[in-house]
């Protein structure tokens, strides 16, 4: 009886597993998940940095925190446009001297654009050749990979700036 129950349970699980089928647009779907995580962490980091620390830079040769934020804004608007094959938004260019409130709003808008653009993305165009940067041709898939790695790199940098100022980054804060 016990053996019959186990065989029945396993066969039911196998039927369920095979009924799932392959995921639709696994690359685009995965990129959307990564973007959502990046959005929460990066916006949280930008909001956590005090306004008077936006001019902070760890060494003379490194960029300020505000410069990092400006870079993130431009990166998001450009790379999500390329990855999803949608036009980049027409926005006022952010500047390092902009206020914290203005930079927070712009980084939020850049992630909103990414969410919207990636919502329209599917895997069918990943092999298309695109002008990635500076006339360099690459498959659209490269833009998706650069987006994912860039988001990780940018958040890691923002987290370091926070820690150097005694602030715990969002991803390291205990969730209750």
Provide a role label for each language-model segment.
Residues 7-16:
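Bacterial N-terminal signal peptides
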Residues 1-4:
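Positively charged n-region of N-terminal signal peptides that target proteins for export
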Residues 19-27:
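Cleaved targeting-peptide boundary
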Residues 96-131, 138-154:
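Acidic/histidine-rich alpha-helical segments that form the ligand environment
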